[in-house]
A protein has these predicted regions:
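RNase H catalytic domain
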Residues: 10-14, 51-118
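RNase H-like nuclease fold core
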Residues: 1-45, 49, 53-63
Length: 118
């Protein structure tokens, strides 16, 4: 099974009041969405949290359809060059705030058939 996810995060101030949103699409139809208020965070933390939420939500959608994560392919669309490059392995993860978030993304990715970023 293949699902697309779109996610974004942002902050007012950096750090500042932050939030993120994620949606799961099956073809061109949105099948699930989630928004989260993050209190105070940087833009990059909000972007990572949006990705984590998107992956978790896609796994939940697949589960409701009787599909295991191991059978799920996810195409991620997001505008954060930092997150895309780090998760694609092209950039190092240097900032200590990013490391646990990136580790959580990698944990989720390890349960899936495939994840691609664009």
């Amino acid at each position: 099974m293949r699902l697309d996810v779109e996610c974004d995060g942002g902050s007012r101030g950096n750090p500042g009041i932050a939030g993120c949103g994620s949606s799961v699409l099956d073809g061109d139809q949105e099948v699930a969405a989630r928004w989260e208020f993050i209190s105070k965070a940087t833009n990059n933390v909000a972007e990572y949290q949006g990705l984590i939420n998107a992956l978790e939500l896609a796994i939940d959608v697949a589960g409701m359809r009787g599909v295991s994560p191991a059978e799920l392919e996810i195409q991620v669309r997001m505008d954060s060059k930092l997150v895309v490059e780090q998760m694609s392995g092209r950039w190092k993860i240097k900032h200590p705030d990013m490391k646990p978030l990136a580790a959580r993304v990698k944990e989720l990715e390890a349960t899936l058939a495939a994840v691609s970023y664009n």
